[in-house]
From Swiss-Prot:
TM annotation in the entry: 7-27, 51-71, 76-96, 141-161, 168-188, 220-240, 259-279
Membrane-related topology note: Multi-pass membrane protein
Protein name: UPF0182 protein CYB_0372
Entry similarity comment: Belongs to the UPF0182 family.
InterPro entries per UniProt: UPF0182 (IPR005372)
C-alpha cells in the first residue's frame, strides 16, 4: 500500500511538472514574441487583467460557496468542504476571467456624445457598461444558483431520502438557509429585470429593429414592474426565513407530507412570480402588439422607425453620406473623352482571376513560389496617378518537392518569398498579356517604362512575412538560406533584419523545443548564438495575435515604399450593442468603423498601428487600454499614407445597408417604395452581386455647378431598384488625401432611363456580331470568359467597358483578346479599348 501511495505521488508530481513546464514554455514563447514586436504592454495588460479578474472572482466565489457548504455539511471535514468549494470557485473564476476585456472596456470607456431616445442615456452606457453589468449579473446568478443546488444536494445526501429524514433535513436551520439563498436569487433576478429594460433597444418585436410602440408602452413598464416584484419576492423569502414557513392548514394534513408543507409557501411565492411575469411581460405586450399596433402600425411606429433609420445610418457610418443629383448635360462625345484621358488611361481591363492565372503562368518562376492573391493600388508615376495590380511572390513550402521537404530545408533553407509582380490595369501586350512594370527575379523594372524606376524600385525584396508563410524558421544560423534561384545556380543570403527572437542559450532552445514539440530544435548543430527564431509569420495570424479584438479586412495588400515592402491592413472596431441599429443578415454586429490602419514590415515583421477614425468611441477606449500601441494617423510617413485606400469589405456592407437606409422618410421606408439593390452579373450561369471596383476618375461637378478637375482614386458601386435592372444611383468612397473616407451618392433623375449593368450585359449577349464571334471561339478549342462590366462615370454620362478573355481548354493562360464598350444603346467589340471608343464615338470615315 505504501509503495502504491508513493507511485501515485510520483505520477502526480510528474504530471504537475509537465503542466508547469508546458505553461512556462507557452508563456515564454508569448513573452519573447511580444517583446520582439515591442508590444509587451499588450501582453502584460492581458495577463494582469485576466488573472486579476480571475483572482477576485475566485475569492468572492470561495467566500460564497465555502461559507454555505461548510454551514450545511456537518458530516464532512472542514478540509473536504473547502476542497469542494475551491473546485467550484476555480470553475467560476475561469468563466468570469474570460470576460477580462469587457472589464477593461468598462473601466476605460468615454462618452459618445449621443443619447438613446428612450432612456436618454449616453450611448457609451450601451457599448461599455451594459455588457459588463449583464455579464456580472449572469455570473452572480449562476454562482448563487449552483451554490443553492449544492446545498440542497448536501442536505439530501447527508440525511437520506425517507420522509422522516426529509423532515429532519428540512429543519428550521435548513429552511432558513435555503430561503436566504432563494431570496438572494430573486434579488439578483430583480437586478436582471432592471437590466432587461435596456435590452428593449435591441428588440425584434416591431416593424423595425429596436424598441417599438409595444416595447415602450407595454414591455418596458412590465419589465420595470417585474424588477420590483422580484425584489419583493426576495423580501418574502427572507421574511419566511425569519418567521418560519410551515403552513399548518387542516386540509393539508390529509394529503400533504409534513416535509412538503415546508416547501409550499416559497412555492406559492415562486409560482406567483412566474404567473405575474407571464401575464405582464409576455401576454400583455403581445395583446398590445396584435390588437393595437398591428392595425395602426405606421401611425404608432413612426417615431421608432425614425429612430431606427437615424441610428442604423450612424452605426454603419452613413450619417454623413453626401447625396447629389447626377448632373444632366449633353451626350458624351469624342472631345469630352479626350478631356478625360486620366480616367480612360486607368480603365481596369484586367480582372483579378484571369490576371492571377497569368501571373502564375509567367512569373512564379519555381514551383515553390506562389501568388496567393492580386491586389489593387495606385502610384504617382511621372506626375500622374496610375492604377496598378500586383501580387506578392510568396514561398509555399508545401509546393517544395516531397523529397526536399526535410527538417533542415523547412527550418533553415526555404525561409522567404521574393518580391512581387506589378502591372498597370489598362495596358495589354499584342499577345493579350499584361505588360509588366515590375517582374522577374530579382525584381526588374521594364525598360519600356523608365519613369517607374524611381517609384517602384525594390531594394529589399525578401518576404519573410506573408499570407502563405506558415513555417517557423531559424535565420542567422550556420546554414545558408535560399535567397532566389538564378539561371544556373542558387543565390544564397543571410538574414540581416531585426525580426525574430534571439535564442543564444540552451534553456531557451529547450523551452522552444518543448512548446513546438520538436526535439531537433534542442539538438541541431546549425544553431548558433547569432541565430534568431522567426515564428508566427503568417501575417493574418501575426496581427490577430496582437489585437484579437479588432475585425480585419480580408484583403491585406503590399506597398512599395523607399525600396522596402510593407503589408497594409484595414482593421475594424465592431459592436452588436448599438441601439436601434439594424443588423445585416449574416453579420453579428450593428456598428462598425474602419478605425485602424496597420502596417507590417514584410522583412522585419514589425507592426505599426494607426488610429484612422479618432471619433470612434471604441478605438478611444482601446487606446486608453493600450496607450503605447496606437499612433495618430498623422504619424504615418506621408509616402505610406498615400497608399491608404477605402476598404472593400466595409464598403460592401455600407452599400448594402444604404440600399434601404437612403430612405429617410418613415412612410417611404415603411412601404419600401424606393428600395434599391446591388445589381447582379452572371458568372457560370449563376447570378452574383457585382463587386465594388476601384477606379481613378474625375468626379462629376457638384450641385452648385463647380467642376472637379482632379482625378482621384475611388471605390464605386452602382444601384438598381429592387426587381428591376435599370440604374438609379451609384455610391463612391473617396480614398485620397483630405477627402479620404467621404461617401458620395449620385442619384439619377427618375424621368431618365439609365441602363443598368445587367441590361448592358444582356445587350452584349444579344448583339449578333458579338455572340457569333464568341460562338466561333468556343468551337475552336478555346474558352471565352467575359470580365467584370465596369460602370465609368464621365462628366454627365456613363460609359460601360467589359474585357473579354480567351484561354485554351487545355491551358490556363487567359489572354485579353477583345474589349467591349457600350454607351446608351450602342455596343461595340474591338481588339483594344482605344479602338472600341473610336468605334463608338467617331464616324466611320474619320477612324
Amino acid at each position: 500500500m505504501q509503495r502504491l501511495r508513493r507511485g501515485l505521488f510520483l505520477l502526480l508530481g510528474v504530471g504537475l511538472g509537465i503542466l508547469a513546464i508546458t505553461g512556462l514554455a507557452a508563456f515564454y514563447v508569448d513573452l519573447a514574441w511580444f517583446a520582439e514586436l515591442h508590444a509587451l504592454p499588450v501582453l502584460w495588460t492581458r495577463v494582469i487583467a485576466r488573472w486579476g479578474l480571475g483572482l477576485g472572482a475566485f475569492l468572492f466565489a470561495l467566500a460564497v460557496t465555502g461559507s454555505n457548504i461548510c454551514s450545511c455539511w456537518r458530516g464532512a471535514t472542514l478540509a473536504g468542504a473547502w476542497a469542494i468549494a475551491t473546485g467550484l470557485s476555480v470553475f467560476f473564476a475561469g468563466s468570469l476571467s474570460n470576460h477580462w476585456f469587457t472589464l477593461l472596456l468598462w473601466l476605460n470607456q468615454g462618452p459618445v456624445g449621443e443619447s438613446d431616445p428612450i432612456f436618454n442615456r449616453d450611448l457609451g452606457f450601451f457599448l461599455f457598461s451594459l455588457p459588463f453589468w449583464e455579464t456580472l449579473q449572469h455570473w452572480c446568478f449562476n454562482l448563487v444558483l449552483l451554490t443553492l443546488i449544492a446545498v440542497v444536494l448536501i442536505y439530501l445526501v447527508e440525511l437520506g431520502l425517507s420522509e422522516q429524514r426529509l423532515t429532519l433535513a428540512l429543519s428550521l436551520y435548513a429552511q432558513r438557509h435555503l430561503l436566504i439563498l432563494g431570496g438572494s436569487l430573486f434579488l439578483i433576478r430583480a437586478w436582471g429585470h432592471w437590466l432587461e429594460r435596456y435590452e428593449l433597444l435591441y428588440s425584434t418585436r416591431g416593424v423595425v429593429f429596436g424598441a417599438g410602440f409595444a416595447d415602450v408602452h407595454a414591455t418596458l413598464p412590465a419589465t420595470t414592474l417585474m424588477s420590483g416584484v422580484a425584489g419583493l419576492t426576495a423580501v418574502g423569502f427572507w421574511a419566511l426565513a425569519r418567521q418560519g414557513i410551515r403552513l399548518n392548514l387542516p386540509f393539508l394534513k390529509s394529503w400533504c407530507p409534513s416535509w412538503a408543507s415546508s416547501l409550499l409557501a416559497p412555492a406559492i411565492l415562486w409560482g406567483a412570480y412566474l404567473g405575474f411575469g407571464l401575464l405582464t411581460t409576455q401576454l400583455y405586450p403581445q395583446l398590445v402588439q396584435t390588437f393595437l399596433v398591428t392595425p395602426n402600425e405606421l401611425e404608432l411606429e413612426r417615431p421608432y422607425i425614425e429612430d431606427n433609420i437615424r441610428f442604423t445610418r450612424a452605426g454603419f457610418g452613413l450619417a454623413d453620406v453626401e447625396v447629389q443629383p447626377f448632373p444632366e448635360g449633353g451626350a458624351l462625345t469624342w472631345e469630352i473623352l479626350q478631356q478625360n484621358q486620366s480616367t480612360l488611361s486607368n480603365v481596369r481591363l484586367w480582372d483579378a482571376d484571369p490576371l492571377l492565372a497569368t501571373y502564375r503562368q509567367l512569373q512564379e518562376i519555381r514551383p515553390y513560389y506562389q501568388f496567393p492573391y492580386v491586389n489593387v493600388d495606385r502610384y504617382r508615376i511621372g506626375g500622374e496617378l496610375r492604377q496598378v495590380m500586383h501580387a506578392a511572390r510568396e514561398l509555399d513550402f508545401a509546393q517544395v518537392p516531397p523529397a526536399a521537404q526535410t527538417w533542415v530545408n523547412r527550418r533553415f533553407f526555404y525561409t522567404h518569398g521574393y518580391g512581387l509582380t506589378l502591372s498597370p490595369v489598362n495596358v495589354v501586350t499584342p499577345e493579350g498579356l499584361p505588360d509588366f512594370f515590375l517582374s522577374d527575379i530579382p525584381p526588374r523594372v521594364s525598360p519600356r517604362y523608365p519613369e517607374v524606376a524611381s517609384v517602384l524600385r525594390v531594394e529589399q525584396p525578401a518576404l519573410y512575412y506573408g499570407e502563405l508563410t506558415t513555417t517557423d524558421v531559424f535565420v542567422g544560423a550556420e546554414a545558408r538560406e535560399l535567397d532566389y534561384p538564378a539561371a544556373e545556380r542558387y543565390v544564397y543570403s543571410s538574414y540581416r533584419g531585426s525580426g525574430g527572437v534571439p535564442i543564444p542559450h540552451l534553456w531557451q532552445r529547450f523551452l522552444y523545443a518543448w512548446h513546438f514539440g520538436d526535439l531537433r530544435i534542442l539538438l541541431s548543430r546549425e544553431l548558433s548564438s547569432a541565430t534568431r527564431f522567426l515564428y508566427r509569420r503568417q501575417i493574418r495570424e501575426r496581427i490577430r495575435r496582437v489585437m484579437p479584438f479588432l475585425l480585419y479586412d480580408r484583403d491585406p495588400y503590399l506597398v512599395i515604399q523607399g525600396g522596402k515592402l510593407y503589408w497594409f491592413f484595414d482593421a475594424y472596431t465592431t459592436s452588436s450593442r448599438y441601439p436601434y441599429s439594424e443588423h445585416l443578415p449574416g453579420f453579428p454586429f450593428n456598428y462598425i468603423r474602419n478605425s485602424v490602419k496597420a502596417v507590417m514590415d514584410a522583412y522585419n515583421g514589425s507592426i505599426d498601428w494607426y488610429i484612422a477614425d479618432p471619433r470612434d468611441p471604441l478605438i478611444q477606449a482601446y487606446a486608453r487600454i493600450y496607450p503605447t500601441l496606437f499612433k495618430p494617423l498623422e504619424a504615418m510617413p506621408e509616402p505610406l499614407r498615400q497608399h491608404i485606400r477605402y476598404p472593400q469589405d466595409l464598403f460592401r456592407l455600407q452599400a448594402q445597408q444604404f440600399a434601404t437606409y437612403h430612405m429617410t422618410d418613415p412612410r417611404l421606408f415603411y412601404n419600401r417604395e424606393d428600395q434599391w439593390q446591388i445589381p447582379g452579373q452572371f458568372r457560370n450561369r449563376r447570378r452574383i452581386p457585382m463587386q465594388p471596383q476601384y477606379l481613378i476618375l474625375t468626379l462629376p461637378r457638384d450641385p452648385q455647378g463647380v467642376a472637379n478637375h482632379t482625378p482621384e482614386f475611388v471605390l464605386l458601386s452602382p444601384y438598381a431598384p429592387v426587381n428591376k435592372q435599370n440604374m438609379v444611383a451609384w455610391i463612391a468612397a473617396r480614398c485620397d488625401g483630405e477627402n479620404y473616407g467621404k461617401l458620395l451618392v449620385y442619384e439619377f433623375s427618375k424621368q431618365r432611363l439609365i441602363y443598368g449593368p445587367e441590361q448592358v450585359e444582356a445587350r452584349v449577349n444579344q448583339d449578333p456580331l458579338i455572340s457569333e464571334q464568341i460562338s466561333l471561339w468556343n468551337q475552336h478549342g478555346s474558352r471565352v470568359n467575359l470580365g467584370t462590366l465596369l460602370v465609368i462615370p464621365i462628366e454627365t454620362s456613363l460609359l460601360y467597358v467589359q474585357p473579354l478573355y480567351i484561354e485554351a481548354e487545355q491551358g490556363r493562360l487567359p489572354q485579353l483578346t477583345r474589349v467591349i464598350a457600350a454607351y446608351e444603346d450602342r455596343v461595340v467589340m474591338e481588339p483594344t479599348l482605344g479602338q472600341a471608343l473610336e468605334a463608338l464615338f467617331l464616324p466611320r470615315g474619320s477612324r
